[in-house]
Amino acid sequence: MHDMRNTARLVGVCSLVGGAAWTAACFVHNSLPQGCIDAECDGHAMRGSSPVATTLFVVAGLMLAGAGVGLLLLARERNGGLGRAAVAAGVCGALGLLLLGSAAVVSAVDNDWNGMPGLVVPGVLLLAAGLVLLAVAVIRARVVPVWCSALLLASALVLPFANEQTSRILLAVPFGVCWALLGVVVLRRPAAVQREAHAGAGTM
């Protein structure tokens, strides 16, 4: 019981910090000169990154990864085990974060590397797929209110349309806001999350 409450609180803190860092990173990144997409890059420099934006995105990635793992643990307690959606969410999310992390490292070394889309595009798609599956697993387990999971799901579906080269990076802002909101919800009701998880496990 005590461990589940601690897990819920950890999820809340990671979600809130990660969501806030992600949102701030999007605005900081958008303050940089506009980049280019595909054919527009002929004679036009791609948008790089800044140390502040990169640091914020790294913090956000680590915090949200921790929050995602915590949510899966709560869902496992709720359902008495991890379903296929939860396992697939973990795999897709991990691969997506690995690719995006690699892109961040490469960007710090060479902002104009032509192969960047090969890391960013599949990374974003895998991350979005993992988040959709995570939202499905959380909705099924009712770890948090359904409306909160639904907002996270909707923001994940918008994520692939964001692009770090233009102001379309702001399409990723709702994703960070929804994670921060989820963190607030969990922190305000960690005991309730714990009770729901154990109640669900008891009915399996």
Predicted regions and their residues:
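Hydrophobic, aromatic-enriched alpha-helical segments typical of multi-pass transmembrane helices
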Residues: H2-M204
